[in-house]
Structure formats: structure tokens, C-alpha cells
Swiss-Prot record:
One of its GO terms (biological process) is cell division. Residues 570-632 form the FIP-RBD domain. Residues 238-254 have a biased composition (Polar residues). It comes from Xenopus tropicalis. It comes from the Eukaryota. This is Rab11 family-interacting protein 4. Residues 17-52, 50-85 form the EF-hand domain. The gene is rab11fip4.
């Protein structure tokens, strides 16, 4: 089973270890212990160890549905999908959602990979590289720690027997399946050149130090962290995991000649962006190796490696061998690796040259298109200048026409404003005159209203008095009518009585004459006495009736006098009202036409009432006492 392949976690033991460590990382990120990691909390933790864009990309891969939180199943799904184990995730975890981009290329050593294999992890997963470093830090495993474990295994492989060599290789495969499975295939490949590029063929001491240069950094000073160097915390963890033993002096490793020749070529200036990224990554690896060598002066070999060396030496001495043969074999294997790496780099340079030629053709095509576009731009610029010239001419003509129109309108508006100003001044003068007349008319109206109110009050008083006098006149007329009827009845009764007395007197006279003629009547003395007594009674009755008649006449005269006096008083009041009305003639000049017409109607009504009243008085006098109207000398 190859290291770094997706089938590595398929072993139940490896799968359990892998999921257990993923669970430890998930629990470390789950601060609330509710079974979910908030994306904000995850990004905040990631910003402490990586750049913001990389952390955001990683969070987007772990939370593809943008739910705002990451469950353990999604967490495992994202990590395994980044490792290229999407099919394995669907089979084991039962995840059915759409997974991020994955890598299914089988694992091959760095020096034996094809260009297509390298382009995947080196170019397409740059953000995943930093994201995987974040997960490795959470799990306590960093790049430096992995390099230390890898170099420790190399020491065991070179200084042990063939049987121990096989066992160590199996143990390394277990580590790759369990611990190294947190990385993408490309990221695991990035670690191998660091170990292999440090070998040299100069001396045996340099070979030993190059083999052990990634195992432990000793007690030297901490180096500054940079994107191309391991984190100091990872170095401290490596120091804690390794046992302190005897130190072995280190020597600087050598970068392959073919790579350095490629870096110094003049063709780097015309490489495309994809090639520049590849070369930058190689330069970064070389800088990291140099930085590790420069900042680790006191590297120590681990106690395990030192024990293996002693055991290997004892086995070799017992078998009449020497360590130099082992060193020679190791050097041969390293030379083979370097040769393979150089051949791979030559192949890569050839591909880059082909890409450069292709890019040259594309560049020529783009130049021709650019020339065509430049000519087109020049034509459009000429057209634009012509349009600008025409537009300026049209603008000048329109501006001139608008200025003339504006001046004409300004003159017309000026003349209109002068006329309107004169009209406004005239209206203001008329308004002032009207205000003066209005004030005078208001005062005159107030005075007329007061006079009218006084006349109206007097008219109401006169009307009340006239009504009272009319009532009194009606009562007196009723009483006079009753007296006339009573007097008429008494007069008729008196006339009847007188007629009766006359008839009786005539009858008595006739009876007396007959008695005297016949001589047969009663005695004359008695008859005369009866006649005399009867005459006396009649005379008394006549006097009484005369007195009553005289009294009635006196009462009638009194009533006529009262009626006349009342009529005269009413006439005087009407004449006084007419006089007062005539006193208003002085105000005719200041009164309006409507007021004059109303006053004239009132005067005519008063005159009509006076005529009717005079006619009534004359008729009453003619009926009751015509002697009043007689003209006496």
C-alpha cells in the first residue's frame, strides 16, 4: 500500500486513528462543545496561523452550503475531499452533498511525478497548503515535526540491518497513513524534496549531517517565522518529542546543479504566470533549506537514532564489515535520487520551453491583434475629433442663437416690466384714494346707522303710543255707541210716552165733552182732580226725561271732546314726526340714492296715514257734532 494514497485510511486501524485525530482537532475548535464549529470562530482561529484569503477558502470548502456552522461530518468530508478521498468519504461517512474539488491522482515520489501530477498540488491547492498547516497545528503535527519523523526513519533505514530496515519502512507507512493523511497528496510531496535535496557527494560527514538535519534543531536560537520557514512553535514541539543526545556538527547541503542553472537563466523574464509560480515554489523550498541550515548550528541526533547507529556498527563489526560500505551505498542511492531529480527537472525545463514557444505564438498573435486594435483606435480617435469639431461648431451656433433670443426676450421683458411698474403705481394711488373714501364712508355709515337707530326707537315709541290711543279710541267709540243706543231707546220711549199721554189727553178731553153734553158723567170735581193729578205726574215725568236727555247730551259732548282731543294729539304727533323727517332733508346731499328712495317711501306712507286719519275725524265730527265745523263771524 503506497503512502499518501486515499486507500491508506481504508485500514480499520488507520481509519480509527485518522478519525480520532480529526475528532481531536474538531473538539479543539468547538469552543461551545455543542457539536458544531461556527464559521466566524473557525476563521478567527485560522487568522492566527495563516492568511485571511486562505482561511476563507478553507472555511468555504468545509461549509459549502453556507450554513454558518460546520458539523463533524462536514468537517471530515471537507478534509478527506481536499485529500482526494471523495469516493471514500461517500462510502464510509455516507455524505451525499456536493464536495469541493478533490484530487484522485495516486501517490508517487516527488522526483518521479509527471508534470500533470505536480501542477495539481503546486498550483491548484496553494490555499489548501496553508489550510492544511492550520489543521496540522491544531493536531500537534507541523511540517517541521513531520520532517523530523521522516529524517528519524531515514536514520533508522541507513544504520540498521536489512530486517530492521523493512520494519522501519512499514512503520513509516503506518505514520503516513495515520498522521500524514491530514495533508493533501501535493503537500506530502512538498516535504520529501526537503529531505532529499540536502544530500551531497562531497564527504561522509556531510552526508550524515544532511540526513539528520531535519530531525532536531537542538538548543539553538529561535528563528524568525516566515512563509518559507517552519513555525518556531513546531520546532519547540520537535525538540520536546526528541531525546537529547550527543550533538553532531552539520554541514550545508547543496542544491542540485540543474535547478540552480535553471534559476540563473535569462528565460525567467518571459515565463508565463504558471511557470513563475512553479519556479517561485522551488525557490521557496531552497530558501527554507538554507534558512534551516543557517539557523540550526547545534543540531543533536536523537537517542533512538544514536542507538540504531551503535547497533548497526556492532552488527557490521561482528560481520567483519565497516560503516564506510554503508555510507558508500547511501551515497550511491542519493546520487541515483539526484540523477532522477535532474532528469525530471530537465524534462520540466523542456516542457517550459515548449510552453514558452506556445506563448510566443500567442504573443505574436496578440501583437497582430493589438496592431489592428491600435489602427482601429486611431480611426476612432480621428472620428471622435471630427465629431468634437462638428459639435463645437453646432454648439457655437446654438450659443449665438440662444444669446440673440435671450437678448430679445430681455428687451421685451424690460419693456413689459416698465409698463407693469407704471400700472402698479397707478393702482397703488387708486388704492390709496379708495382707502381714504372707505374711511370717510365708514364714518358716515356709522353716523347714519346711529341716526336711523334713534329714529327707529322713536318710531317704535310712537307706534306703541298710537296703538294705545287707538285702543282707547275704540273703547270710547264703543261706549259712545252704547250711549247713543241707550239715548235713542230712551228718546223713543219718551216719544211713545208723550204720544200715549197725548192720546190719553185727547181721549179725556173727548170724554169730558161728551160728559158735559150728556150730563150723565161723574161729578166734575172728582174728574178734574183725577185729571190734574194725572197731568202733574205727566209733567214730572216729562221734566225727568228732559233732565235725563240733557245729561246724555252732556255726556255725548264730553265724549266728543275727548275724541277730538285725542285725534288732535295724534295729529300733532304725526305732524311732529313729519317735521323730524323733514329735518333730515339736510342730509339728503350726503345720502345715497337708495337711502333717499327709502326715506321718500316712508314719508309717502306717513302722509297717506295722515289723510286717512283726517278723513275719519271729519266724518266723526259730521256725524256727532257738525256745529264744530261751522264758520262763525
Amino acid at each position: 500500500m503506497e503512502r499518501g494514497s486515499c486507500s491508506a485510511p481504508g485500514d480499520p486501524g488507520h481509519l480509527g486513528l485518522f478519525l480520532q485525530r480529526l475528532r481531536q482537532v474538531f473538539d479543539a475548535c468547538d469552543g461551545d462543545a455543542d457539536g458544531f464549529i461556527k464559521v466566524e470562530h473557525f476563521v478567527a482561529l485560522g487568522l492566527q496561523f495563516a492568511q485571511g484569503d486562505e482561511v476563507k477558502k478553507l472555511a468555504k470548502r468545509l461549509d459549502p452550503n453556507a450554513q454558518g456552522r460546520i458539523g463533524f461530518k462536514d468537517f471530515c468530508h471537507g478534509v478527506l475531499a481536499m485529500k482526494g478521498c471523495d469516493k471514500f468519504v461517500k462510502g464510509i461517512l455516507g455524505v451525499t452533498g456536493t464536495a469541493p474539488q478533490h484530487y484522485e491522482a495516486p501517490y508517487t515520489p516527488y522526483y518521479y511525478q509527471s508534470p500533470e501530477t505536480i501542477e495539481g498540488p503546486f498550483l491548484d491547492t496553494e490555499s489548501s497548503y496553508s489550510d492544511s498547516e492550520f489543521f496540522a497545528y491544531e493536531d500537534g503535527l507541523t511540517l517541521s515535526h513531520r520532517d523530523a519523523q521522516h529524517e528519524s526513519d531515514l536514520d533508522s533505514a541507513m544504520y540498521s540491518t536489512p530486517s530492521s530496515e523493512a520494519s522501519d519502512e512499514g512503520r513509516n507507512e503506518d505514520k503516513a497513513g495515520g498522521l500524514g493523511s491530514l495533508y493533501l497528496p501535493g503537500e506530502q510531496n512538498l516535504l520529501k524534496p526537503s529531505a532529499g535535496s540536502g544530500f551531497s557527494t562531497h564527504s561522509t560527514a556531510s552526508l550524515i549531517s544532511n540526513e539528520e538535519q531535519f530531525e532536531d534543531y537542538g538548543e539553538g536560537e529561535d528563528i524568525d517565522y516566515s512563509p518559507g520557514s517552519p513555525c518556531p512553535d513546531d520546532e519547540s514541539r520537535t525538540n520536546a518529542l526528541s531525546d537529547l543526545g550527543s550533538s553532531v556538527p552539520s554541514s550545508a547541503g547543496q542544491t542540485p546543479r540543474k535547478a540552480r542553472l535553471m534559476y540563473n537563466t535569462d528565460l525567467l523574464d518571459i515565463y508565463c504566470t504558471q511557470c513563475s509560480k512553479k519556479i517561485t515554489l522551488l525557490n521557496d523550498l531552497e530558501a527554507r533549506l538554507k534558512n534551516l541550515k543557517a539557523n540550526s548550528p547545534n543540531r543533536k541526533i536523537s537517542s533512538t537514532a544514536f542507538g540504531r547507529q551503535l547497533l548497526h556498527n556492532s552488527n557490521l563489526s561482528s560481520s567483519n564489515g565497516s560503516t564506510e560500505d554503508l555510507f558508500r551505498d547511501s551515497i550511491d542511492s542519493c546520487e541515483n535520487d539526484i540523477t532522477e531529480k535532474v532528469s525530471f527537472l530537465e524534462k520540466k525545463v523542456t516542457e517550459l520551453e515548449n510552453d514558452n514557444l506556445t506563448n510566443g505564438d500567442v504573443k505574436n498573435k496578440l501583437k497582430h491583434e493589438n496592431i489592428h486594435l491600435v489602427h482601429r483606435v486611431h480611426e476612432l480617435e480621428e472620428f471622435l475629433r471630427d465629431q468634437e469639431t462638428k459639435s463645437e461648431q453646432v454648439l457655437d451656433e446654438e450659443s449665438k442663437r440662444h444669446r440673440e433670443t435671450y437678448s430679445k426676450l430681455a428687451r421685451e421683458k424690460g419693456t413689459e416690466i416698465v409698463l407693469l411698474s407704471a400700472r402698479v403705481q397707478e393702482l397703488q394711488e387708486e388704492n390709496e384714494d379708495l382707502l381714504t373714501s372707505l374711511t370717510r364712508l365708514k364714518s358716515h355709515t356709522v353716523r347714519i346707522d346711529e341716526e336711523r337707530q334713534r329714529v327707529w326707537d322713536k318710531l317704535e315709541d310712537t307706534s306703541l303710543r298710537l296703538k294705545d290711543e287707538t285702543d282707547l279710541y275704540k273703547r270710547l267709540m264703543d261706549k259712545l255707541r252704547q250711549n247713543r243706543l241707550h239715548f235713542q231707546k230712551e228718546r223713543e220711549a219718551t216719544q211713545e210716552l208723550i204720544e200715549d199721554l197725548r192720546r190719553e189727553l185727547d181721549h179725556l178731553q173727548i170724554y169730558k165733552l161728551e160728559c158735559e153734553r150728556s150730563g150723565r158723567g161723574p161729578p166734575s170735581g172728582l174728574t178734574e182732580l183725577n185729571v190734574k193729578s194725572r197731568e202733574v205726574e205727566l209733567e214730572q215725568e216729562i221734566r225727568r226725561l228732559k233732565q235725563d236727555n240733557q245729561k246724555l247730551r252732556d255726556q255725548n259732548d264730553d265724549l266728543n271732546g275727548q275724541i277730538l282731543s285725542l285725534s288732535l294729539y295724534e295729529a300733532k304727533s304725526l305732524f311732529s314726526t313729519q317735521t323730524k323727517a323733514q329735518s333730515l332733508a339736510a342730509e339728503i346731499d350726503s345720502a345715497s340714492k337708495d337711502e333717499l328712495m327709502e326715506a321718500l317711501k316712508e314719508q309717502e306712507e306717513i302722509n297717506y296715514r295722515l289723510r286717512q286719519y283726517m278723513d275719519k275725524i271729519i266724518l266723526a265730527i259730521l256725524d256727532h257734532n257738525p256745529s264744530i265745523l261751522e264758520i262763525k263771524n
